[in-house]
Amino acid sequence: MLVKSYAAAVQGISATVITIEVNCTKGIQFFLVGLPDVAVRESHERIISALQVSGYKFPRNRIVINMAPADIRKEGSSYDLPLAIGILAAAEELDASRLGHYMMMGELSLDGSLKPVKGILPIAIKAREEGFKGFIVPKQNAREAAVVNDLDVYGVSTIKEVIEFIAGRRDLEPTVVNTREEFYARQLQFEADFSDVRGQENVKRALEVAAAGSHNLILIGPPGSGKSMLAKRLPSILPPFTLQESLETTKIHSVAGKIGLDTSLMTQRPFRSPHHTISNVAMVGGGAFPQPGEISLAHNGILFLDELPEFNRSVLEVMRQPLEDRTITVSRARLSVDYPANFMLVASMNPCPCGYYNHPDRPCLCSPGAVQKYMNRVSGPLLDCIYIQVVVVQLPFENISYGRSSECSEAIRERVMKARAIQEKRFAAHEGIYSNAQMTSKLLHEYAVPDAAGLSLLKVAMQRLNLSARAYDRILKVSRTLADLEASPNIEACHLAEAIQYRSLDRETWGT
């Protein structure tokens, strides 16, 4: 008997329906075709054991299984469940008429229990688009899939539950998630707050500007000056996720298997902080069977690179194109996939190998050549992509005393959100543009025109600091954000002066 069950394959962050055709006839052979990988071919043994433990027998017939379309590679063990159900239906131990209503995914253990799988959210979205009545998934994945409206999601623990449900001998209750209620309830819960940081008001101001305009940022300073502490509090002043942003980001983390068990939607912007030994592929994504990298996992959030010069130079250079395009294309012989990469880059570094160049109290042990060599580990074009460059200094005791109060993240976030609201209104007619950092050259000429005094100041700065055309654009974008923070429709000289101050690596002559 020929029957069909349905699953899906994930490519990039979208899914494609996989039709599993099972034909059971007289004979004793087992064939699995349709470009399955090793893990899929090994499902034969898992299915036999799972069915036996659950009280069912694997059919002693000639079984031919085709996973269509055949040009898409099927990877992983997530097809175990639809394969097993299809085999039972083809052997006439199940009513095959109900299989067409449901999509199924799940890895089988030898005892018949189901293990969670990756990529459930994009698969659930595809199941709804294709008109399936329900989606049967491991219980741990149910809440993640249930955020998709107009689709009944059934979380199950064993294959026996699925068999009895398809046979009509068991009722399963769909998993229900109040997406909006859960999303908004946990949106503003942060472990770290800017009130924890004493002093460093100029750096906090720079972080506020970066958050308001989604500008890339680098902090340069000696060890122990608070660079990492400040950077890790940046998510607490970013505007909260919109529901659409949360769905986009959750899809990426779902594909990468980074969603926590029994989790529905991500409620806070991601903060990714990879180690400096990371490889090119782990950073931008790829591999023989492409997976999203750190830049995509940081989509709609922050990618924090601590000790920037310690990263392999090739790793830093491959980030330049995604920083500009806000997407990354991974091409392989059989397919090409696109991953979103709209992240805010935040980096930190010491000013020299020993960390104490220009320190007021501790002597630097590095030669001028060593300092220059250290700084040159980060290329000029990459630094041009970093809008705000700030020197973090060691603070005296008076400034870090716990007796001094410090502004909390909530107060800063309110100002940031007001500036972002101005930008959203400004760019409402421009699809894909939401912040000042995303402005094109055309939009710069329209919305970031300084007054006469500001233009004169900028001309002098360009000449004295020998700034590139790219740095010129960055200064204008940051100036536009500074004006938005003051709700000023015009960019004035004071805004440009502050923006120029945030080009520390252009203003300083390191190692001389």
Label the model's feature ranges:
Residues L110, L303-F304, E310-F311, F397:
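Residues immediately C-terminal
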Residues L219-G260, D325:
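Walker A/P-loop
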Residues K26, F58-N61, R98-L99, G131, ...:
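Short loop/turn elements that form and flank the Walker-type P-loop nucleotide-binding site
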Residues A39-H44, P59, N66-G76, F289-P290, ...:
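Basic, amphipathic alpha-helical bundle interface domains used for macromolecular binding and assembly
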Residues M1-I218, S225, S331, A471-Y472, ...:
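Peripheral, non-AAA+ core regions of ATP-driven protein-machinery
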Residues R170-V209, G213, P240-I295:
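P-loop NTPase nucleotide-binding/switch module
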Residues N300, D306-E307, V318:
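Walker B catalytic acidic pair
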